């Protein structure tokens, strides 16, 4: 059995509630307020869906995010659909650890997250691809922001 840890804390449904903002535009929650997360509208691709630059605690992140389906995991982790600045594709799923001020890219785009047998499973309902299972957040390549 695998236990997912984030900063030494076991991840499970009891201590890692998942919540999603359908759209970040004009939205806020306790986590966004606590970490001073600001979203600035930047552009909109031909297919719709606004794209935003993001700052956390006054620090601008080196990528933009789609405003849709911003997923909060526990009290300090966020999963977003990111793109390079001034673009709208390719889309890459990014985890942002707000407490430790780091982020990790997954090199692919995943639309959905769920806990499954004490692991995280990421899937994509838009594009047919393999699911990704994460056993430990510590195994991701984290970059400071």
Located regions from the model:
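Short amphipathic beta-strand/extended segments with alternating polar/hydrophobic composition
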Residues: 59-68, 105-109, 129-138
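Short, Lys/Arg-rich amphipathic alpha-helical interaction segments
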Residues: 112-145
